[in-house]
Amino acid sequence: MLNTVIVGASGYAGAELAALVQNHPQLKLFGLYVSAGSQDAHKRFSSLHPQWVGALDQPLLPLDEDGMTRILTQADLVLLATAHEVSATLAPKFLAKGLPVFDLSGAFRVRDQQFYASYYGFTHDSEQWLDQAAYGLAEWNAEAVKAAQLIAVPGCYPTASLCALKPLQQAGLIAKGWQPIINAVSGVSGAGRKAAINTSFCEVSLNPYGTFNHRHQPEISHHLGKEVLFQPHLGNYVRGILATIYVQLADGVTPTQVDQAYLKAYEGKPLVRLTGQMPSIRGVAGTPYCDLAWQQQGNMLVVVCAIDNLLKGAASQAMQCINIKFGFEPATGLI
């Protein structure tokens, strides 16, 4: 079994990772780590996430010098569920020792240092690893994931958007010059576990944010190979993303061509479900699935994608990448 370490295990995505690793037949949960100065250090994991009382009672260890030494000498792989700038600093240390790293932050998703200064607010000093990282969109980049030491797990909105749009783009069905319009809503857990006024119980609402400046817009455009118009919303529920996407098709594109594009793209991909009816958050919350459906009228197409932002949009996609990297069946430990 592979000794698996999670850094950033106190957060929502880190907690989902811990549960998935615990249940994976080929992985051993070797350590749950938080920053050395974290107020959660030495607490039991289950005290923060009580659904795991009796099943995951391991302590959250501080990532101090002793912790780093233990990881570098005994771990087989590292999962980072840390802040973007923290991942940018930590990942090269693990990579230099030959450890495979699966990073859930945005630190290595786009091969452009200026992107990080503009959208993430920090200077990226790891150009080497930016160039070598594989973008872990599991259904689309399996060969790159197999070959890479560093896998940048996609963001939640990009996962939903790209799974919906890439079949159309690959098949050349989108009208030339058209920017797909992505209207997406995410549950409050997408904002993370840290307390904030706008995500507190009495303040949370359904509202748009990040208009024209959300960091996931350039990530989507970069990996789609086409500019998009992206408007995210904060939803008044806990988990899940629903993305409704509007596309103008090239002249003469038929419903059969659209259907075939999706069927071809996701044949043999068990975690993408072509539902035949418009997806819902209820259908995917707590699951690793991506549900897709579409409807065409003339040359206009509406595509709807639903995922769990903490699973397919984070932890379970990381697990898919682990399965791909180490030659396990793609859905091992997930379904």
UniProtKB/Swiss-Prot annotation:
HAMAP family linked: ArgC_type1
Which leading EC class covers this enzyme?
A: oxidoreductase
Q: Which SUPFAM superfamilies match?
A: Glyceraldehyde-3-phosphate dehydrogenase-like, C-terminal domain, NAD(P)-binding Rossmann-fold domains
Q: Keyword set for this entry?
A: Amino-acid biosynthesis, Arginine biosynthesis, Cytoplasm, NADP, Oxidoreductase
Which Gene3D superfamilies does this chain map to? Dihydrodipicolinate Reductase, domain 2, NAD(P)-binding Rossmann-like Domain
Pathway, per record: Amino-acid biosynthesis; L-arginine biosynthesis; N(2)-acetyl-L-ornithine from L-glutamate: step 3/4
In the UniProt record, the gene name given for this protein reads argC
The subcellular localization recorded is: Cytoplasm
* Source taxon at top rank: Bacteria
List its EC numbers. Answer: 1.2.1.38
| Organism of this sequence | Aeromonas hydrophila subsp. hydrophila (strain ATCC 7966 / DSM 30187 / BCRC 13018 / CCUG 14551 / JCM 1027 / KCTC 2358 / NCIMB 9240 / NCTC 8049)
**A GO BP annotation:** L-arginine biosynthetic process
Pfam families found in the cross-reference section: Semialdhyde_dh (PF01118), Semialdhyde_dhC_1 (PF22698)
**What is the name of the protein in this document?**
N-acetyl-gamma-glutamyl-phosphate reductase
A GO term, aspect molecular function: NAD binding
